[in-house]
Amino acid sequence: MEKKGIAAKALEQGKGILRLTPTWVPRSFCVPGRRIKLHPDDYYVLGGERGGIDERWFASTTPAKNGPLTGENEGLSAIVFNNGTEEEQVLLKDAVEELKGELIGDRLWDEHKSWPMYSKFFDNMGQLPHHIHHNDEKAALIGQMGKPEAYYFPPQLNNHGGDFPYTFMGISPGTTKEEIRECLVNFTKGDNKITSYSQAYQLDPGTGWDVPPGLLHAPGSMCTYEPQKASDVFAMYQSLVNEAIIPEALLWNGTPEESKGDFDALLDVIDWDLNLDPNMMQNRFMAPKPVKPIEEMKAEGYIENWICYKSDAFSAKELTVLPGASVTIKDSGAYGMIMMQGHGKMGVWDIETPALIRYGQLTNDEFFISEKAASEGVKIVNLSANDPIVMLKHFGPGNPDLVL
């Protein structure tokens, strides 16, 4: 069978819901936190040179930019289609290009000609360096798009918080540009001490943070669900983390060739109003927000919360279907989803939450729901008398259901 056409057949087979394969991504500069359900023997299955697998990407049409050894389709989600005799796969990216608005909705296709977000788990034993994502204007200088992102810390994946469950956000009010410039100039001299000019917040399971472009942040070691714009632009502004040296190349990572070595260009990437915000927690922290009154939802057999809701570039919800309940959930946009807990039925599919996954094994825990299926309503049945179904749902930009 031709690859073209598999996507349409898969959409038909799933009645508007596509089953996706697990998409694992290694990072050479990180130590895995081992909370994303990969088999203990498989965290280094790609070889020591590639580093440990500490990420799983969801609903991704964005290839991982992971150095010269990056695998051919690394970071790209694939769809599984059962043709009656075997399971075939086609990239979600190719399916979006083939099916266009039929899959992601005409609104997103007409505006973006792509699925413009993805989500991931990142799962590190230690914290990441204080770093920054460029806005659209700065990213355009290297042919990329800017990158807003958001964090949510799922209780199901955080039975331990790792070595440093605190995240540095922004720059302490009163800090001058000259002080930050000196940190950047000192990048190659050991610890440039940039987090001395920041503040850290304790991370709590079941909560999240909003991270717009231009905001310095050093993510803590909780296992994190991270919806984000489909871009991979960043620069590391901290030179030493956990006694590990960060290569200078990563400081200039998002800088055009002609500006490399110009520290003022690095300062220009920083959104100073965002970073010096005296109300950082009030403006960036996200506690879950019920989509409607909780008692009303419980009476219908479910609870749904917005968990990422401060960006127009994407949004995310946590849906809980109570034990034994059968519900039909409607959304105005296409979305990807990942199971966190429980088992049951979703449309024509069996859905379940695996306890352990081998590298290369297929699962029934990740799906992509077309706009048409989402707006008509997805029927979910919880087949357990005790265990709730919990899933995380990630949406594209301009979600009509989200009031910012």
Q: Which stretches of residues belong to each language-model region?
A:
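Transition-metal
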Residues: M1-E178, V241-Q282, A316, L404
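A short hydrophobic beta-strand segment most commonly corresponding to one strand
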Residues: L128, E149-F153, G220-I245, K379-V403
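Intrinsically disordered, low-complexity linker/loop segments enriched in Gly/Pro
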Residues: P154-P212
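Loop-centered beta-sheet repeat module
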Residues: K189-A249
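Short acidic-glycine-tyrosine-enriched beta hairpin
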Residues: Y197-D210, G347-I380
